[in-house]
Amino acid sequence: MNLIFRCLVLFLTMMGSEVIFASSGVGNTLDFGELAAFPGAEGYGSMTTGGRGGKVYIVTSLADNGLPGTLRYGIEKLDGPRTIIFQVSGTIFLLKDLKIRKGDLTIAGQTAPGGGICIAGYPVTNYASNVILRFLRFRMGNKECVHPDGADALGGKGAKNVIIDHCSVSWCTDECASFYENDDFTMQWCIISESLRLGGHTKGPHGYGGIWGGEHSSYHHN
């Protein structure tokens, strides 16, 4: 096979398609073996498939009203495997906590034009399995979010097969990024910084990088 054809076959396979060759009237499936979540994925969460083979949902609005075209709609309303890509760039100011409860999800922040995507104002928490988050900025802050005991800018627990890659997480009132009680989890090549020590926590001065743990969890190059 020439190089172009090899690349096409690899692309179709990564998209979840079965590639079949005709040989003497018999179909043969080309098997590449198990594929990583994406090139460069490492650690226990590296084989997460996310939304591979499913629908593609395009974010066309920075609003947080939950209508079609918003990030919240793609996360909370759609079912089944899905990959979320962005036609817009800028900051999504959340109106309330954003909770990921439906798995088989990829959020590809690298698809946003310009300066990319920032998610601000409230916590983002993952409770779903088989989730890929890439190239996103999380800036919770303490202006809109009222959590007396503090809140994590990005967090999650109780999930399996999760990988977070090339994200930056800052401005929390508890921990910036806390992930525990997960299995087959990776957080890699992320910036975790600038917790708000005087952010309004009931304990007084309080603000930390994160609580990390779980079974088969990898934290590297952060």
Per-region residue spans from a language model:
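Right-handed parallel beta-helix
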Residues: 104, 108-109, 129-142, 158-171, ...
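Extracellular beta-strand-rich solenoid/capping regions of secreted or surface-exposed proteins
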Residues: 71-80, 92-108, 115-135, 140-160, ...
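Positively charged n-region of N-terminal signal peptides that target proteins for export
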Residues: 1-6
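Conserved positions at the start
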Residues: 151, 174-176, 207
